[in-house]
Amino acid sequence: MRFVVPPHLVSTALVSALALIGVEAASAQEFAGRDKLFAHSNEFLRDVIQVTDGVYVAVGFALANVILVEGDDGLLIIDTTEGMGAAREVRAEFDRISTKPVRAIIYTHSHPDHVRGSRAFVGDVEPEVYAHEKQLRENLPTAVGRAGRDGGNQFGLALPAESRPNAGIGPGLGLGGGDGYMRPTRTFSGESYSFEVAGVKVVLGYAPGETDDQLFVWLPEKRTLLPGDNFYRAFPNLYAIRGVPLRRVDHWLESLSDMIALEPEYLVPSHTRPIMGRTAVDAALTGYHAGVSSVLQQTLAG
C-alpha cells in the first residue's frame, strides 16, 4: 500500500528543514567569529620584543604598547599605557634591558591608553615630553561621564572574563595604579619636527587619522616606523561606537600614504605586535590603505 503525504505536510517539513539548516549555518558562522576573536588574543601575548638594534616593544601589559628606543646615554619612550600599574610592570622589564635615564617621552596622540603611565618611566632626570600641539587642546587623560560609560560598553568591561577574551586592540583596559599623565613640554604645529635625543635621530610626522592630533615617529637610521594608532592588526577604527569626534578618513588615507612613502623596514604599532621586513611592512600598510579607501569610496557612492 502506497502512503501519500499531504502537500501541506511536505511544505511544513521543507520549511522546517531549511530553517534548521539556516540555524546550523548561523551557529557555524557565530562560532567562527568567536574562534577568530579568541585566536586574536595571540596578538597580545605578554612579551618584550626586540624589533631591531636598540628598539623594543612591550606588548600585552596594557591596552596599548610601550616602545623603548635605546640611545648612547639615555632612553626614549613612546606611549605609556593607560595606568601606572601596567606602566610600572613595563618599566621593570625595560630595566632588564637598560637602566639609562629616560631622556624623552613621545605621545603619538591623546587617547588615555597612551598617556596615563608616564610618571612610571621618570627617574632622577625629568624627560622632555613631545606631542603635536593639537594634543594640548584635545587631551582628556581621564574619561568621564557618557564617554567613560560608552567606552566601557565598547570594550565590554561589564562582561565576565570568559566572554571577553580581549579588547580587539589589546588584552584589556587596565586603569589600575592611578594616573601618571605628564603634560607635553615640547610641541610642534607644522607637518614634521626633527630632533635628536641620546644620539638617536627622530622625525615626528603630523598624521591625522584615528585622532586629529595623531603623529607618527620615524627613526631614519633604523628604518623603523611607529605609526601610533593609524595602523594595527585589526580593522581600522574609522568611527568608535562609544561616540567620538568625526574622524576624517580622507586625512587618514593621506597619512597612510605618507608612511608608505618612507619605505620602512620595521613597523611598530602602538597596538598589536610589530611587523619586520620591508616586504611584509609594505604589504601591511598598502593593504590597510586599500581597505580604508574602499570603505570611503563605497560610502561616498552610496
Which role fits each region the language model picked out?
Residues 8-22:
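Bacterial N-terminal signal peptides
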Residues 1-7:
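N-terminal secretory signal peptides that target proteins for export/translocation
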Residues 45-96, 216-219, 223-228:
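Conserved beta-strand hairpin/beta-sheet module of binuclear metal-dependent hydrolase folds
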Residues 43-44, 51, 72-74, 84-128, ...:
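Active-site metal-binding motif and surrounding structural segment of the metallo-beta-lactamase
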Residues 25-28:
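Boundary at the C-terminal end of the N-terminal hydrophobic targeting segment
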Residues 61, 69-70, 88, 117-118, ...:
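Short, solvent-exposed loop/turn and secondary-structure capping segments
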Residues 32, 50, 74-75, 82-84, 101, 137-206, ...:
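Metallo-beta-lactamase
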